[in-house]
């Protein structure tokens, strides 16, 4: 409900009351203009492809774990990867780290699923963490996942914040096509885009693990080509009315 309805109106208020809209997703902007029948922003800066500022402490050496960062939803796809964890742990030593709000209905359901399937040895659960702790928890993960299964989700138009966080930690992305930067991921070798099926998840995780150093190289190259703008640069854009 919040994602597909309430967010639309929050998005409207944000875009119509700000001097500058900083858009990470051209698909989201196109969907916004279709929905309201007109452009909403006075000035819009398109950050597509989105910039990445790699964390200096991100560890580039071989890693073994998988990360899911953010709000667990019904369509997050965690139910697809959970049954695969014993095999992945046996093959490459992988565990799944779930980091995000711990009291939502879906998060609690996932925790119950972990318990009922006997997966406690293969899953680590965390609440939202301060940035310093987040880096420490994520640094041994070789990929970040976003396996959205609902093509009608508003998230299908967006660039999930978790994607930027993954790339900042030099982690390639394993995602379904239900996001706003499929082209960026594929064209820049930043991860793997798949259909939401268990067999594809299994083979793709193995590929990302095997080729993680090549993906790290691609991420560093991308970050160099797409740096963040400074606050001064944004303020100048507002002043100039660009």
What are these regions (language model features)?
Residues 34, 39-63, 77, 242:
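Acidic anion/phosphate-binding donor-loop and adjacent secondary structure
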Residues 137-156, 171:
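Acidic donor-binding loop of glycosyltransferase active sites
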Residues 100, 108-136, 143:
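Nucleotide-activated donor-binding/catalytic signature segment of Leloir-type glycosyltransferases, i.e.
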Residues 135, 157-169, 182-183:
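Short alpha-helical segment that forms part of, or immediately flanks, the ligand-binding pocket
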Residues 50, 57-85, 97:
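Conserved donor-binding/catalytic core segment of Leloir-type glycosyltransferases
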Residues 4-43, 52:
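A short, active-site helix/loop in glycosyltransferases that binds the activated sugar's phosphate group
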Residues 196-198, 209-241:
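A charged, aromatic-enriched C-terminal amphipathic alpha-helix characteristic of glycosyltransferases
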């Amino acid at each position: 409900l919040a994602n597909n309805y309430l967010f639309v109106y929050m998005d409207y208020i944000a875009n119509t009351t700000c001097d500058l809209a900083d858009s990470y997703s051209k698909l989201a902007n196109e969907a916004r203009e279709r929905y309201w029948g007109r452009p909403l922003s006075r000035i819009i800066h398109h950050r597509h492809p989105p910039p990445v500022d790699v964390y200096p402490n991100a560890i580039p050496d071989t890693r073994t774990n998988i990360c899911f960062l953010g709000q667990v939803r019904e369509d997050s796809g965690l139910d697809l990867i959970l049954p695969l964890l014993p095999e992945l742990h046996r093959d490459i030593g992988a565990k799944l780290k779930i980091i995000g709000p711990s009291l939502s209905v879906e998060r609690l359901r996932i925790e119950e699923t972990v318990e009922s399937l006997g997966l406690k040895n293969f899953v680590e659960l965390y609440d939202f963490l301060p940035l310093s702790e987040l880096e420490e928890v994520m640094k041994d993960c070789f990929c970040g996942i976003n396996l959205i299964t609902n093509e009608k989700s508003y998230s299908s138009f967006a660039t999930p914040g978790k994607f930027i966080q993954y790339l900042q930690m030099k982690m390639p992305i394993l995602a379904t096509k239900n996001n706003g930067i499929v082209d960026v991921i594929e064209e820049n070798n930043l991860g793997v885009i798949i259909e939401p099926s268990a067999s594809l998840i299994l083979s793709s995780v193995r590929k990302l693990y095997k080729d993680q150093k090549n993906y790290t190289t691609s991420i560093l190259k991308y970050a160099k080509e797409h740096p963040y703008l400074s606050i001064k640069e944004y303020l100048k854009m507002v002043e100039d009315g660009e």
